[in-house]
Curated annotation (Swiss-Prot):
PANTHER family: TRANSCRIPTIONAL REGULATORY PROTEIN YEBC-RELATED, TRANSLATIONAL ACTIVATOR OF CYTOCHROME C OXIDASE 1. Residues 1-20 are annotated as: Disordered. One of its GO terms (cellular component) is cytosol. Belongs to the TACO1 family. GO terms for biological process: regulation of DNA-templated transcription. Transmembrane segments: none annotated. One of its GO terms (molecular function) is DNA binding. Its main location: cytoplasm. It comes from Paracidovorax citrulli (strain AAC00-1) (Acidovorax citrulli). SUPFAM superfamilies: YebC-like (SSF75625). This is Probable transcriptional regulatory protein Aave_3203.
Length: 239
């Protein structure tokens, strides 16, 4: 199955993350904190915590820093309590945007997200206004040049739902959220390490943007992603 290229978007985001390592760590620590408080500190029994730890390792967070934050989240020490809130809205050309946040102050967060939408050409919507245009899936993306046949064989055998080849040769493996970890482990055991892997919100249909519209949309997305309380931003724009 062929699909739109996601490779440029991944490289753009990786470049920005390299520039903002401290902020990335802060977001991952929030994820570890929420996951550990919700499901406990036993990594073997907490898939969400395992995913957060994988992100921490990918961001080169030291093991002792990871352990400290798990212990802090599951111990008796006082700490911030984070609330998970999702916002939805529209960007340039009517593109759909989902913004997932973790916050200790929802009044501050909604004001910042709303301001970003309005200042940079978007519109904040109501709950459910765009989420129906996305599916909750596991997603693993391999660089152009990876063996499509090998990825497909291993992924489908491990329980993947689909393997998509993008127009630039990047390969996208899609799974049910509950099968994500098993498929990822099988691929890595076969020597196939994805360049990006996460449980995400994937758009059913993409909207093509080019030229000035694409630049404005990218600016809006970058501004939203830079907000302190924002964890993830999903959209259906093909930039």
């Amino acid at each position: 199955m062929a699909g739109h290229s996601k490779w440029a978007n991944i490289q753009h985001r990786k470049g920005r993350q390299d520039e903002k390592r401290g902020k990335i760590w802060t977001r991952i620590i929030r994820e570890i904190t929420v996951a550990a408080r919700a499901g406990g500190g036993d990594v073997s029994a907490n898939p969400r915590l395992r995913l957060a730890i994988d992100k921490a390792k990918a961001a080169n967070m030291p093991a002792d820093r990871i352990k400290y934050n798990i212990d802090k989240a599951t111990g008796n020490a006082e700490g911030l309590t984070y609330e998970e809130i999702r916002y939805e809205g529209y960007g340039i050309g009517g593109a759909a945007i989902i913004v997932d946040t973790m916050t200790d102050n929802r009044v501050r967060t909604v004001a910042e997200v709303r301001h970003a939408f309005s200042k940079y050409g978007g519109n904040m919507g109501t709950e459910g206004s765009v989420a129906f245009q996305f599916k909750h899936v596991g997603q693993l993306i391999f660089a152009p040049g990876t063996s499509e046949d090998k990825v497909m064989e291993v992924a489908l055998e491990a329980g993947a739902e689909d393997v998509v080849t993008d127009e630039d040769g990047a390969i996208e493996v899609l799974t049910a959220p509950g099968d994500f970890e098993a498929v990822k482990n099988a691929l890595e055991a076969a020597g196939l390490t994805p360049d990006a892997a996460d449980v995400t919100m994937r758009p059913d249909v993409t909207i093509d943007l080019a030229g000035e519209d694409a630049e404005r949309m990218q600016k809006l997305l970058d501004v939203i992603e830079d907000l302190d309380d924002v964890q993830e931003v999903y959209h259906n724009a093909a930039l």
